[in-house]
């Protein structure tokens, strides 16, 4: 076999051998010397799924009562001043409003999934309302 000339090749810079003992010792002694422990973080989506299960199980109202009552009174002022509301009337309005919003968000989520996305966007809400016939 004929001999060929060897050309000098540049090193690819492989990983340098690490000193195992020094790093292990430092890792073990860090908490003892007052090292700050990192707070536990769940993987992205885990907490969201837990919240979905929690709120699907529950029946309590999700909008705070007093801010909703102020909003109702503010809107009613445009039609007639000095209106009075029974507490049961405000509760019924809130129940209906939350039921409407939950249904709208369910339809909005379906629109986002149909578009091969997991994030809902304003255009999904607009499409859901358009399909329902609420907005031309």
From Swiss-Prot:
Residues flagged as site, Recognition by ATXR5 and ATXR6: 32
Residue numbers spanned by region Disordered: 1-43
As stated in the Swiss-Prot or TrEMBL entry, residues carrying the post-translational modification N6,N6,N6-trimethyllysine are 5, 10, 28, 37
Question: What main location does UniProt list?
Answer: nucleus
Q: How is it modified after translation?
A: Can be acetylated to form H3K9ac, H3K14ac, H3K18ac and H3K23ac. H3K9ac could compete with H3K9me and prevent gene silencing. H3K9acK14ac molecules are 30-fold less abundant than H3K9ac or H3K14ac. Very low level of H3K9meK14ac. H3K14 is specifically acetylated by HAG1 and deacetylated by HDA6. H3K9ac is deacetylated by HDT1. H3K9ac is restricted to euchromatin. H3K18ac, but not H3K9ac, is cell-cycle dependent and linked to replication. Reduced H4R3me2s increases H3K14ac in the FLC chromatin and activates or maintains its transcription.
- Name the PANTHER family on file: HISTONE H3
Does this UniProt record's set of keywords contain Phosphoprotein?
Answer: yes
For this protein, the record's PROSITE patterns field holds: HISTONE_H3_1, HISTONE_H3_2
Q: Tell me where in this chain the PTM Phosphoserine is found.
A: 11, 29
The subunit field of the Swiss-Prot or TrEMBL record says: The nucleosome is a histone octamer containing two molecules each of H2A, H2B, H3 and H4 assembled in one H3-H4 heterotetramer and two H2A-H2B heterodimers. The octamer wraps approximately 147 bp of DNA. The H3K9meK27me dimethylated N-terminal tail of histone H3 can directly interact with the chromodomains of CMT3 and/or LHP1. Interacts with ORTH2. Interacts (in absence of H3K27me) with TSK.
- Protein's name in the database: Histone H3.1
Q: Which residues carry this modification: N6,N6-dimethyllysine?
A: 5, 10, 28, 37
Per the UniProt record, the site (Not N6-methylated) maps to: 15
At which residues is N6-methyllysine found?
5, 10, 19, 24, 28, 37
Cellular compartments per GO CC:
chromocenter; cytosol; extracellular region; nucleosome; nucleus; plasma membrane; plastid
| Functional summary from the UniProt entry | Core component of nucleosome. Nucleosomes wrap and compact DNA into chromatin, limiting DNA accessibility to the cellular machineries which require DNA as a template. Histones thereby play a central role in transcription regulation, DNA repair, DNA replication and chromosomal stability. DNA accessibility is regulated via a complex set of post-translational modifications of histones, also called histone code, and nucleosome remodeling.
- List, in alphabetical order, the Gene Ontology terms for molecular function in this entry: DNA binding; protein heterodimerization activity; structural constituent of chromatin
Which tissues does it occur in?
Expressed in inflorescences, buds and seedlings.
Q: Where in or outside the cell?
A: Nucleus; Chromosome
**Keyword flag Ion transport:** no
- Where, per the database record, does this protein carry N6-acetyllysine? 10, 15, 19, 24
Q: Which family does it belong to?
A: Belongs to the histone H3 family.
Residues carrying Phosphothreonine: 12
């Amino acid at each position: 076999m004929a001999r060929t000339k060897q050309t000098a090749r540049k090193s690819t810079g492989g990983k340098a051998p690490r000193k195992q003992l020094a790093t292990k010792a430092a890792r073990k002694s860090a908490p003892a010397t007052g090292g700050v422990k990192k707070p536990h973080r769940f993987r992205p989506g885990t907490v969201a799924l837990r919240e979905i299960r929690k709120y699907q199980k529950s029946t309590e109202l999700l909008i705070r009562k007093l801010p909703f009552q102020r909003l109702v009174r503010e809107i009613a002022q445009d039609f007639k001043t000095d209106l009075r509301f029974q507490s049961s009337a405000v509760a019924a309005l809130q129940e209906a409003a939350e039921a409407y919003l939950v249904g709208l968000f369910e339809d909005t989520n379906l629109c986002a999934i149909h578009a091969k996305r997991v994030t809902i966007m304003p255009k999904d809400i607009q499409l859901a309302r358009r399909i329902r016939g609420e907005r031309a």
